[in-house]
Amino acid sequence: MPSDVVAAVDQTAASTLLGAAEAALGTLTKTGSGSLGPLGASYSASASFSGGTVALSPPDTIAIDNLQIDYSLGLTLSVDLSFLDFCIPQICIWTPFGDICTPKICFDFPTISVTVPFASSATLSADFGLKVHLTSGDWYVDVVIESVPALDLGAAAVLLLAAIGSAISAALLAVPFIGPLLSIAVAVITAAFGLADVTGLLGPIVSAFVAGLTFTVYKQPQNFQVLPALPPYNPAVMVSLAAVSADVQATDKNELVLSVDI
Amino acid sequence: MSLTGTHHAFASIDERGVNRALQAFFGARPHYLHYGSVPFVTSDSTTETLVQTIAFPGVPGGIAYAIDLTIPTTDLYPPDGALPPPLVLGPDQLSLTTEATITIGCTAGQSADGKRGQVMPVSTSLDVIAIGHPVSVYFSPGVGYVRFQLDQVLVENVAPPSLQAVLDCLLEMILSAVLSSVELPFNIIDVDFFKLILEAGPTIADNQIEIWGDVS
Amino acid sequence: MTALDSRVIGIGSCFAHRFSSPGTLQYSLSPLPSALTTGADRASSYSVTVSADRNDRPPRQYVTVRQANGRLVASPARLEITAGDIVVWSADRTVPFGFRVRGTIGSNVLDSAALVTESIYTHAFGLAGSFEWADANGSDLRGQVTVAMPDAAEGHERWLARIGEGALVHVRGVSAEPADLQIVVGQTVVWAVEDAPGVTITDASLIGIGGSAASAGR
């Protein structure tokens, strides 16, 4: 039996709806930990989505090409500098009052935390499926990613590697007595990990935002308000959205169709 | 043929949906169906509307009356069945049927049972059929509504024809006034799927009201 | 790593004094430069006894200051030396900020925060930069130490050899020779103070005079 209400959009309007859904999703955040070669790493990351071109494909697929993910990362690396431990030997020097010798002074280098801020973007193309559900009294039509595509993070990994190197150098400069050991320290530390390690750290962080990516293109309460209350004698007019379905229908145009019984 | 056609967005509500919307509207705001003067209605409320008595010289306090309507039922083009002549339901039209009960307060001296000095209600119920068409009012993307404008009203089974003409006109005025308060906002036609920029419609075909446009 | 400030002797710094005449120094330790007064000398816990006899004692002796149970402790608490010997006070890693030595020997006051004569302050520089120093007690004494990064081409071994060489600044009165000194990171500068009016060797930025331009702190 046909539905009481039918609302449809073509691919052009579907792109508009998707853009609104991307904006409504806002900024997602995640925290976690991993490793960068031998270095411990913890991070807080955020991501938002925008853009993309929509292709509707029956019966229920929405392909989005070139969806942009803008992400930022606050990476904290734990760097153990104990390999630099050394001692200033006893020095003996003539003074007008006689020779003086200072005691030997040994320095243990600490484990330092290096914070690396980083931001970049990537694009992805993927198929999304339609999922209609009634949850906590609200009807949802969600567009849900069907599989996580491979993300091209090569260029970003190169930039992140450089940013890590710069951050480590800057952090080391503040460690007393590191001065002449700085180049040794930087060389040893940065040799401990490479581009593959950075990619191995960055990839799962960004992919975590893409896995299960869901845009809500429709959300309305089942108890749907047609007209608001107009005091003193006009209560709100409500209807119940008894059933909701969504699909992609193909005729001379492919359209995203929402069907509702009230 | 696509639903959106040369536009980017489409929305429709079928006959059953319109009737459910009218039931919801008049169910929440029954005062649009019940009108009366004292003593039938003493004050405005959500259930009834107070009107003035009909002033007439020599009738103390005027002629008391009440008008009660049942929730109208619509039939969208094409018609589900034949309409009584001369009514014809054409494309982009809908018919509305309702039962109108007209009551007057008959003061004793005019009443049939001979009691003097009391106001006795005297009622008659009439089947009313009207033909109308939808009109859109658009303000901004997603903000607007469809209302109904009557083209013709017929009160069935009234004689002589002159009385029918009087009642047709009376009920047309009353129904037009009632329907002027009835709005089908865009958000029930598209269930708020999008903010519609209206470009075409409303039209009535295939037992549904249809509108087209773009989204913002 | 402590700042360049003879008022607070911390890791990488030393205070030393040559005791020319026999006598006994009664002294106290303080974590703060201003905490010790003449009155506190009466409760002095530590001593250096200077005698005329050598008795096979070495000419340089060392006092290590450590932190124990919230207090500064000198070890050894009592030292016996020969006139002409130098005593070197230094902190170990338990001392969080540094210490001040103040006491009296006869009618003379010995104070690491007010260097007079035959007193020495040493400081190892851990960071590159330009460090202007001055007297926190208000005299015109001042100078500059420029600390450079070692030449990478010279190699790590050459640098380790260089930091075994100290650099001397001879302070006479309120004049320093040399007033400007160039060293590399890790080297120790030794200020030998003679006939001064009770001076300090203090980073000028700590006392609001001019400033130091360390490349990454001090």
What are these regions (language model features)?
Chain B
Residues 1-113, 142-216:
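Tubular lipid-binding modules of the TULIP superfamily
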Residues 85, 128-139:
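Extended lipid/amphipathic-ligand handling interfaces
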Residues 114-131:
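Amphipathic hydrophobic-ligand
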